[in-house]
Amino acid sequence: NSAHPCCDPVKCEPREGEHCISGPCCRNCKFLNAGTICKKAMLDGLNDYCTGISSDCPRNRYKGKEDD
């Protein structure tokens, strides 16, 4: 049972100096750069992009409500 390299095993949060543990916009314990595609476009033709400040992949703000 090996500990996750990004995770402080005592506090269960990113180690000091690291940004994140996992997520579509997290790689090697760091947030991916803003503008990195985290979800490729489907029928709507709009990709979703990382923000550079979160490990989540936010929905493209230009997608309409019907694109859910």
Curated annotation (Swiss-Prot):
Domain Disintegrin: from-to ranges: 1-65
Subunit description: Heterodimer; disulfide-linked.
Keyword Secreted attributed: yes
Role description: Poor inhibitor of platelet aggregation. The disintegrin inhibits the adhesion of both the alpha-4/beta-1 (ITGA4/ITGB1) and the alpha-5/beta-1 (ITGA5/ITGB1) integrins to VCAM-1 and fibronectin respectively with almost the same degree of specificity. Inhibition on alpha-IIb/beta-3 (ITGA2B/ITGB3) is low.
Protein name stated in the entry: Disintegrin EMS11A
Database matches in Gene3D superfamilies: Disintegrin domain
SMART domains: DISIN
Similarity remark: Belongs to the disintegrin family. Dimeric disintegrin subfamily.
PANTHER family linked: ADAM A DISINTEGRIN AND METALLOPROTEASE DOMAIN (PTHR11905), ADAM METALLOPROTEASE (PTHR11905:SF159)
Domain of life where this protein originates: Eukaryota
Further details from the record: Negative results: does not inhibit alpha-1/beta-1 (ITGA1/ITGB1), alpha-2/beta-1 (ITGA2/ITGB1) and alpha-6/beta-1 (ITGA6/ITGB1).
Keywords, comma-separated and alphabetical: Cell adhesion impairing toxin, Disulfide bond, Hemostasis impairing toxin, Platelet aggregation inhibiting toxin, Secreted, Toxin
Tissue specificity annotation: Expressed by the venom gland.
Compartments, record wording: Secreted
One term of GO molecular function: toxin activity
Organism this protein belongs to: Echis multisquamatus (Central Asian sand viper)
UniProt-listed InterPro entries: Disintegrin_CS, Disintegrin_dom, Disintegrin_dom_sf
Presence of keyword Disulfide bond: yes
GO cellular component: extracellular region
Pfam families recorded: Disintegrin (PF00200)
